[in-house]
């Protein structure tokens, strides 16, 4: 938290691994979304998601968005940064 506050990043990614038989997850997140997250951050999540989807589609890689991993609890690795000025994202990889 101290380093985050000193650096004030514009983008923060929380990377995770899922089961080997899973696909990939990236923003936009599932509902509910914390109502205190600014619209500009939510717009950024959508833009990152569109960019990711375009590349995944281009190469025929399976993925999903908005089905899991909400952005509500303020202590998540994506919501806390989003509540503190960064575009906070969770990525799950197979």
What role is predicted for each listed range?
Residues 1-94:
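Structured catalytic-domain cores with a bias toward divalent-metal coordination
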